[in-house]
Amino acid sequence: MKDITDMEKDRQYMKMALELAQKGMGFTAPNPMVGAVIVKSGKVIGQGYHRKYGELHAEREALASCTEQPEGASIYVTLEPCCHYGKQPPCVNAILESGIRRVIIGSSDPNPLVSGKGIRILKEHGIEVTENVLKEECDKLNEAFFYYIQNQKPYVVMKYAMTMDGKIATYTGASRWVTGEAARMHVQKQRLKYTGIMAGVGTVLADDPMLTCRLENGRNPVRIICDSHLRTPLNSRIVKTASTIPTIFATSSKDQQKIKNYEDMGCKVLDVPEKNGHIDLNRLMELLGAAKIDSILLEGGGTLNWSALESGIVQKVQTYIAPKLFGGESAKTPIEGKGFPDPASAVLLKNSEIIRIGDDFLIESEVKSNVHGNC
């Protein structure tokens, strides 16, 4: 059995690998974020991370960076090494060829092409394998990837900002700004993190947003607009920039001239059936999953947020709370619609974390599974 000192060293090096993995945020999808650190005789001799989809995996980048021969060394990797050919050859092969004698793994890979096979191959070749080091942190790093690979649908995060009395705007509709600059910058990092960003036509008509990532060297998410009847103006900022920023309109409209107008501007138009008078969000998730969109930041208004909850497509809720009070009986709230009839039928949240960001607070919670049989 390993002593406390060795276990602590394992955690320390895995933490380094996690920090490396996070550098790939926003650029690896539909692949996971992965970091790797190679240690020999108590010294780090190589490190790497998966920088971008299609480029070197973390293990191969770490091996390529080694300052001395890795024979007899240990490699710390946040996710089980792959054992199949994709955009890159199997990392298991590279590890075996390198002479590394010990592999320390954070998360097992749920991908059915890997799922325990990489670990088994390593063990069959006499490699010492230690599993589940900082497993919780490594799992959380790739929660969107894990959900997508198991369900073939995007991992959906509902995000909204509100005052302490639960308002997302004043009674006049003014909403700039509910939260402070630090919280708004945090939102930009979320836009980088997730592959897509989704809003409803109501938000587009009210705010004419861009829904882009404003971080330096950031990557714009794929913009997804739920617009049943294609009411978004062709001179809106989203449509006018669709030729340079990937933009999808989900609609049930059969008006071929309207559809052509959007497509001529560079938009992709998805034909999605209606359900209860709105876009069928479950069908939309299937279509987006097939298009390799593995995660979505939902920045909808109250109507779309309600539809998303009612449809059971939301896995996480991010609530930014500003220390302000707007009041107003008619001031909008984050989730509207008809609502649930009683407390027993409410959507339940779990594993809530509270983070202070400047003067504001972020409460991040997971949606508890199977509350309504479809969440």
Segment roles from a protein language model:
Residues 3-31, 47, 87, 155-156, ...:
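Enzymes that bind and transform nitrogen-containing heteroaromatic metabolites
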Residues 26-28, 119, 133-161:
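Proteins enriched for Cys/Gly/acidic motifs involved in redox and nucleic-acid/cofactor modification
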Residues 33-34, 93-95, 162:
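Short, flexible segments with low predicted structural confidence
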Residues 38-137, 222, 248, 255, ...:
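Zn2+-dependent cytidine deaminase-like catalytic core
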